[in-house]
C-alpha cells in the first residue's frame, strides 16, 4: 500500500507579500525550496499561525536569497504580510520506505533565513 508522509517543511516562515490579483499559488525563495527539497509546481499545504487558516496550493520559484514568501490569488484573503506560516510538502511511499524516511524541516528566522535544518519532526518541541 502507498501512503502519504511529510517530506519537507518550512517552519516559522514569515509572509512577505500577499498578491490577490495574481493567478493562484505561493511564491517561495528558491534557496528555501532547495534547503528542504520542495520543487516548483509541487503541491503544498500552508497553515497560518495567526488565524488558523489552512490551504493547499502549488509552488512557484521565487528569487534566490530574497526570502520571499508570497501568497497569491484567493489565498491572499487568508494570509497577510507579517503572518507566520508553516509550509508542508508530502511524498508517497510504501510503509517499508517510510521506516527509513526522514523529512527535512527548516526552521526559519524572522528574515526567512534557515536558522536550523532538522531531519526529523521532534515530538513536543517548541521552536
From Swiss-Prot:
Active site: 25, 58
Cofactor comment: Binds 1 pyruvoyl group covalently per subunit.
Pfam families: Asp_decarbox
Major location category of this protein: cytoplasm
Cofactor section: pyruvate
Keyword ATP-binding recorded: no
GO biological process, one term: pantothenate biosynthetic process
Catalytic activity: L-aspartate + H(+) = beta-alanine + CO2
Record-level Gene Ontology MF annotations: aspartate 1-decarboxylase activity
Highest taxon above the source species: Bacteria
Family per record: Belongs to the PanD family.
PANTHER family: ASPARTATE 1-DECARBOXYLASE
Protein purpose: Catalyzes the pyruvoyl-dependent decarboxylation of aspartate to produce beta-alanine.
Protein's recorded name: Aspartate 1-decarboxylase
Record organism: Exiguobacterium sp. (strain ATCC BAA-1283 / AT1b)
Lineage: Bacteria, Bacillati, Bacillota, Bacilli, Bacillales
Amino acid at each position: 500500500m502507498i501512503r502519504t508522509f511529510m517530506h519537507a517543511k518550512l517552519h516559522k516562515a514569515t509572509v512577505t507579500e500577499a498578491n490577490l490579483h495574481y493567478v493562484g499559488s505561493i511564491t517561495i525563495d528558491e534557496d528555501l525550496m532547495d534547503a528542504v527539497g520542495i520543487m516548483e509546481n509541487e503541491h503544498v499545504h500552508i497553515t497560518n499561525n495567526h488565524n488558523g487558516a489552512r490551504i493547499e496550493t502549488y509552488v512557484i520559484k521565487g528569487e534566490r536569497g530574497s526570502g520571499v514568501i508570497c501568497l497569491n490569488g484567493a489565498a491572499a484573503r487568508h494570509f497577510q504580510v507579517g503572518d507566520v506560516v508553516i509550509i508542508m510538502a508530502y511524498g508517497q511511499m510504501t510503509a517499508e520506505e517510510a521506516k527509513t524516511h526522514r523529512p527535512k524541516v527548516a526552521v526559519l528566522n524572522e528574515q526567512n533565513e534557515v536558522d536550523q535544518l532538522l531531519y526529523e519532526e521532534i515530538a513536543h518541541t517548541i521552536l
